[in-house]
Amino acid sequence: FKRGRVESGCELMMYDEKRTGGAGMVEKEEFYLNSTNGVNKLHVILWHPLEEIRAIVQISHGMCEYVDRYDRLATFLAQHGMMVIGNDHLGHGEAAKGEEELGYFPKAKGSETVVDDLYKVTKSIRARYPRIPYFLLGHSMGSFMARRYLMTYGSQLDGAILMGTGSQPPALLSAAKTTANSLSVVRGEHHRSQLMMKMAFGSYNKQYPSVRTEYDWLSRNDANVDTYLEDPYCGFMFTLNGYKVLFDVLSFIQEPAHIGKLPKEVPLLFVAGSDDPV
């Protein structure tokens, strides 16, 4: 790859390799932006079609994964004229400073910081392409962040795709928040709790008659599940701090007053697996 600079002054890494597929060629770039937490660097990837750009799609990835897992989707979209951009959330991928920071959101004001980071990425690319239609795609936990984004910065979007989104009963969410807060006092925010993991995901496999792994609920394709399990940047256990951020965004987006802030003029597409437990 070759190195350059972007307008923010951050280092840019642009791969010389150009991909071809069923349509146009794609150029893949990587660069870093400062997180709004003032501490971490956001790892950002840009899939750039080498033809006229029809639209821009920003990805908000899910829990315990990272944005480059969407490479096949992003490449496909870029081959069909859509620029794709996305960053690793705090506590994920290259935004984490080490293995101990996976599942931990440093200096975060709950989910607000994650959403502000998403908006910072939006501004970085919007400044270069101000007139091109702009869409936000959020998956699973990333869809929760996308929904909070819509409530705060929705006027910046021409549409949004919410994949595998959901909600939690207020009583259950309140109990989970209380448990996470209590455990944090005793064990510290970096603690990785089996109890919290069971509370959050313990029921997800129960609807399936036979299971191979604890993550079978992720996909009906066994190869997809195995790829996830074999990836050191996937499937790690969240810290108590991470669960508090997750519960924070769920609480925020389920508040009736916040739901009323969703921009009515922004179209939404909801997508989910037929047996998705989320």
Indicate where each model-derived feature is located.
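Short beta-strand/loop motif that positions the catalytic acidic residue
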Residues: F270-A272
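Short beta-strand element of the alpha/beta-hydrolase
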Residues: R54-G62
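Active-site glycine-rich loops that stabilize anionic/oxyanionic intermediates
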Residues: H61-E65, S274
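Alpha/beta-hydrolase fold nucleophile elbow
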Residues: Y129-S140
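Alpha/beta-hydrolase-fold enzymes
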Residues: A146-Y233
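Conserved alpha/beta-hydrolase
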Residues: A74-E100
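N-terminal cap/lid segment of alpha/beta-hydrolase-fold proteins
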Residues: M25-P49
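Alpha/beta-hydrolase active-site loop
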Residues: P106-R126
